[in-house]
């Protein structure tokens, strides 16, 4: 029986869908606690069930998954006869293993209410319990999950041949491998529906060729659905996927002014915190303790995998024991990713997931209270997806992005232009020099205890800088504006790494640390043994002779010649960089070039606007610039 909707919501009642839903589907959504459809479900489900191609753009956490799962299972269960053995009726493609797995488990929850399908998916293992048997002519949905890293292609094919699934949920690469087998069939007589979840990400450069190869193997006469939180940014590529006169569904959220221009849930409050460089990490502790009630599930976003590895070791020293810190990134083995993801989801104590953008899209992590972006993403469109991990399904959530003082504060205006407004963090936070010193001291103590942690820190810092230098809003995030010494101390480094970006740095590269590097040891005995061997080799004859030769070469080279050589090398580097940029530009489509031009124009206009505002403030003429703006205070989590 369908759940009874609240008064005044009959247009979103589950039993009011046309074509009507099966009774078992109504029972399933009722048991899941969905009293009525979300706006995206109310719009997309009837269209997709009515044999329309759909392009669905909706805010994150709006119920997109059921918007395509329900039409697919309804379609497969309303066929005139069962799909032939080893024939596929529908495919759902996801960009990540985690999202594909999540979709698959939601599908299993749905099919548990359809006895014929449930009997195939979860056969009883207890011989004393009589199994309900259904004739072979009974229509069933038999799904298979295809994930790279957890099984081999041969194992996937073996399972396909044994179970003959008619619905595949997969990542692009593993799906293409299966479809390449002559034993897997997707003819027009059998294949019904294709869904691309997180479509804009699937259409990124990394997936284009694979996706095109998949689509070539599918019949043109099919129903296709593209679902994403930002499908508008990939509209120019949708035609290539082969939609036939698609219906576009766009669901937006009203902002406080009443205008439908926000691209995030109304229950999500997005904020920023300007943080002095030296306080980059101890600010995280302030944020966690300033929010009331204490967030039970928090996500910290870092920019790189190396950064996650290093921060997972040092942040507990700063945050204390109040929170369980769990790391997750794309370079973890598949079993580690799954284990850590489940640890976070199932944690009953306050937990923090420290992750990269692998967790920014699609994953429906329940009950996330707080999202903190330690580093703003290099791709601005990822910002909204990171924030959207909180405030899902109407639950109150809070997101914070950390910005350095100065030019980075222009990012606030940049986001506003992109219809993603952020407000100042609602709780006042004060920083003290002694606190920063204590944090640096605690981290350095751990780093000094094991040279391996120093190596991880150096690698993490370099990878962070490379990510920072590739930010699309490059006039806001400028490497030249970074405070190197404060950053190094905040990261707990013992010295700044050797990098081209530090070529003209004249400050203290040792960061005030006096250390005998020859005596600096690894905790791991094998690594320490190898280090000592290399150290001894460098001190023996070959190393001495080589050093002597280098000294002689240096002594016989005129200073003017060395300067000239450096200038030539710098010139060659600049020429090489220009060639690379030219080649990259030539390989871009006109649409991609136009996007870059628009971003550059947007950033420049924001820079000019902010410069003018700063000039007016200095002149004392902008007292009322922000008058009349309502500030919404965060009232706690649900």
From Swiss-Prot:
It comes from Aspergillus oryzae (strain ATCC 42149 / RIB 40). One of its GO terms (cellular component) is nucleoplasm. Keywords: ATP-binding, Coiled coil, Helicase, Hydrolase, Nucleotide-binding, Nucleus, Ribosome biogenesis, RNA-binding, rRNA processing. This is ATP-dependent rRNA helicase spb4. Component of pre-60S ribosomal complexes. One of its GO terms (biological process) is maturation of LSU-rRNA. Residues 283-437 form the Helicase C-terminal domain. It holds the Pfam family CTT_SPB4. It catalyses: ATP + H2O = ADP + phosphate + H(+).
């Amino acid at each position: 029986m369908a759940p009874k909707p609240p008064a005044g919501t009959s247009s979103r009642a589950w039993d009011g869908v046309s074509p009507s839903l099966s009774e078992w589907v109504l029972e399933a959504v009722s048991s899941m606690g969905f009293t009525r459809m979300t706006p995206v479900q109310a719009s997309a489900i009837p269209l997709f069930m009515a044999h329309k191609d759909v392009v669905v753009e909706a805010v994150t956490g709006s119920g997109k998954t059921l918007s395509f799962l329900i039409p697919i299972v309804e379609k497969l269960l309303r066929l005139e006869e069962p799909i032939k053995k080893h024939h596929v009726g529908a495919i759902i493609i996801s960009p990540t293993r985690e999202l594909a797995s999540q979709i698959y488990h939601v599908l299993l929850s749905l099919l548990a209410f359809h006895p014929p399908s449930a009997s195939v998916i979860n056969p009883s293992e207890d011989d004393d319990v009589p199994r309900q048997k259904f004739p072979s002519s009974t229509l069933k949905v038999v799904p298979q999950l295809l994930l790279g890293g957890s099984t081999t292609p041969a194992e996937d094919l073996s399972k396909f041949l044994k179970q003959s699934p008619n619905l595949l949920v997969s990542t692009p690469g593993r799906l293409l491998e299966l479809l390449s087998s002559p034993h897997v069939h997707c003819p027009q007589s059998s294949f019904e529906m294709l869904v691309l979840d997180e479509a804009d990400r699937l259409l990124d450069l990394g997936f284009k060729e694979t996706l095109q190869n998949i689509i070539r193997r599918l019949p043109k006469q099919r129903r296709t659905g593209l679902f994403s939180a930002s499908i508008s940014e990939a509209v120019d590529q949708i035609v290539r996927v082969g939609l036939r006169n698609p219906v576009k569904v766009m669901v937006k959220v009203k902002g406080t002014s009443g205008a439908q221009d926000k691209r995030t849930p109304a229950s999500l409050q997005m904020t920023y915190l300007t943080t002095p460089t030296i306080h980059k990490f101890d600010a995280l502790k302030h944020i966690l303790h300033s929010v009331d009630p204490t967030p039970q599930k928090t996500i910290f976003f870092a920019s790189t995998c190396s950064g996650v590895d290093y921060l997972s070791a040092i942040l507990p020293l700063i945050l204390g024991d109040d929170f369980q810190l769990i790391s997750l990134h794309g370079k973890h083995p598949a079993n580690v990713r799954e284990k850590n993801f489940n640890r976070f989801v199932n944690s009953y104590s306050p937990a923090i997931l420290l992750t990269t953008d692998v967790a920014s899209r699609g994953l429906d992590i329940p009950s996330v209270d707080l999202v903190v972006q330690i580093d703003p993403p290099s791709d601005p469109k990822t910002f909204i997806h990171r924030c959207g991990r909180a405030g899902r399904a109407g639950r109150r959530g809070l997101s914070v992005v950390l910005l350095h003082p100065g030019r980075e504060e222009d990012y606030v205006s940049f986001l506003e232009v992109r219809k993603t407004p952020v407000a100042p963090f609602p709780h006042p936070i004060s920083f003290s020099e002694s606190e920063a010193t204590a944090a640096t001291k605690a981290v350095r103590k751990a780093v000094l205890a094991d040279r391996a942690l120093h190596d991880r820190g150096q690698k993490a810092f370099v990878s962070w800088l490379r990510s920072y230098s590739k930010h699309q809003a490059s006039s806001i995030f400028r490497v030249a504006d970074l405070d190197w010494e404060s950053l190094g101390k905040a990261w707990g480094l013992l010295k700044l790494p050797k990098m081209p970006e530090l070529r003209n740095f004249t400050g203290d590269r040792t960061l005030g640390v006096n250390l005998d590097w020859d005596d600096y040891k690894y905790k791991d005995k094998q690594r320490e043994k190898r280090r000592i061997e290399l150290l001894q080799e460098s001190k023996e004859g070959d190393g001495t002779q080589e050093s002597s030769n280098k000294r002689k070469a240096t002594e016989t080279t005129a200073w003017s010649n060395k300067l000239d050589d450096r200038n030539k090398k710098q010139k060659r580097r600049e020429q090489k960089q220009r060639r690379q940029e030219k080649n990259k530009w030539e390989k871009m489509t006109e649409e991609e070039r136009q996007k870059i031009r628009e971003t550059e124009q947007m950033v420049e206009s924001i820079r000019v606007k902010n410069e003018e505002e700063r000039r007016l403030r200095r002149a004392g003429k902008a007292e009322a610039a922000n008058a009349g703006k309502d500030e919404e205070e965060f009232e706690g989590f649900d």
